[in-house]
Structures are given as structure tokens and as C-alpha cells.
């Protein structure tokens, strides 16, 4: 039945994804709502809220503010807060309320810029899409607003450029708050410095994005931003997840029929890791509840028929019942959906699905 959920909780909406991208960058994040969306973001969708400080606010819209379009009140609140906080920028993030009343985000951005000394960006999310769509919009808005040509990069060749940029690092996508440190170590062991935008690295690194020798896309939501940086600065990008090897336990995968359920980049990185270990192209299907990008399949040389989009719980249940898999990689909360499965179930935690981080 369409929309029926018996096992999975509702996935995080787009405004949560936008907050996740901007959370660690030192800005003032104003969620344009009455308070409910902000409560969900801080209470459920952003695990760093309990460990790391960030200036996340609700606009506190009242009924008549929304009905009469009193943007001036939001501007006044934000300007007052900006005077009391040590922040580097302000971001206004949309929800269903401004979507319904047709808020003009460009006008709002101009009004806020005049009232404060801060750079202001807006993310036109509406609460109707999933978290990854909000991430995609936020990454693009972030690099469009703050990345600029660094004079140092003009005379550099790729070997001289100081770092690798990692785009797509959010808890929703990588499900591990230590993943950024692990990735930095992976590249440090190769004599390179990795910058994980939005997870341990701040706004200055975004401003210096032109210095990157290469960008690594670790989630589908980051692809548009990487393409933008390639167009603007000529920075090449690759699609990969550097920690894929730690997600694949030492098991005999030879000749097995395998299903991997995750976000598209990690799922296909796990596929490649398995094929690397077996030395063969195994019968592997990847599936995701979230966005799919044809460019990712083309880049990784994966047939589109082997990459499935799941929309309903029944899609996953039917896929398992009808295709006879020997091994399934998926979030542990999905195991109860397939009690008749007799093969091997390997936990592959996805915070966006279960709200749980990797142990």
C-alpha cells in the first residue's frame, strides 16, 4: 500500500539536510518555521546537536506573521540575534510555511544583508522533499556564495595544490561522526591533506575551495556542488567513499548474489570493494531509498538495471522475496522486514533510515 509504514520511521525532510550541511560552519542558522521543524532537526535529525554547539534558531513564526507576510519581523529578530552572537554568516532555511505563502528568498536575503554586516544565504527547502535534496541545495548555495578564486591557485599545478576536498560528509549520509577523522588519516597516510567540508572543517576552507587538487564526492547530494566547482575552477572530481573497506567484513562473497541498500555512492563503493576482493564482477544489486544520479552509475561503470530505487516498504520486501539473494547489506532496522530471509544479513548502518549511528 502506497505510503504505509509498518517498519520504518519517516525519513528526514529537506530542511534537516540543509541544516546538516551548514551545522559546523560557524553561522547562524534560522529555520523559517513556527518551532516544530526546528525541534525535529535538533531532537532527531542532527546527532551532533548533543555533542557540538551550533547557532540553530527557529524563526518563531506566528499565524498572522505567515498570513500577512511580515518578513520585517523575521529580519528584525535575525538582526538582533546577529549583534549578540559571534557568527560568520547567516542562513535562512525554508520549511512548508514559507513555501505555502510564497516567500521571496532573494528579497529576504537582500533585506537581511542590509540590516546586518553578515553574509546571508538562503536555502529554498519546503519540507516536501527528503534530506538529500536539502543537502544538495545547501551545498550549491554554500559554494556559490563563499567559494572564490584564490590568487595562490593561479600559478599552481595539480601536484602543488595543498589538499583534497571531500564533499558530502554529513551524519545523514555517512552515519559515523568519526568518519571525517578516518578519511583525513587515509589521505594523510598517502601524503595528502583531506578537507571534509562541513565536518570538522569550517568556512575558511569553503572560501579556499579553488586550492583543492581534486574533490571527492561521497554522496549523491554533493554531485552538483562538485560539478559547479569543476565549472568554476576547473577542479576535477571523483565519486568514491574512501572508507568502503571497513564496511565490508571478511566473508566469502565468491559466486554469491548480493543486495546492498544504502545511499547511492556508498552502496556502489561497497560493490566495488567486494569485486576488488573477489577479483570478479559478482551478481550485485544496489538499492536506495534516496536520490539516484545517472552520472554516478556512468562514472562507476554500473548498469542502471543493477541500481534500484525503493519507494515503499513493499518494494524492498518484494525485491528480497523474488530475487533470491544470498547476502544483504542494509541498515539493521530493515532486517525485521524480511523474517523469511535465510541468507546472511550484514549490518550497514544508514542514519537517514534508522536514526542510528554506526557503533
Region roles according to the model:
Residues 1-359:
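An N-terminal assembly and electron-transfer interface module characteristic of large anaerobic redox
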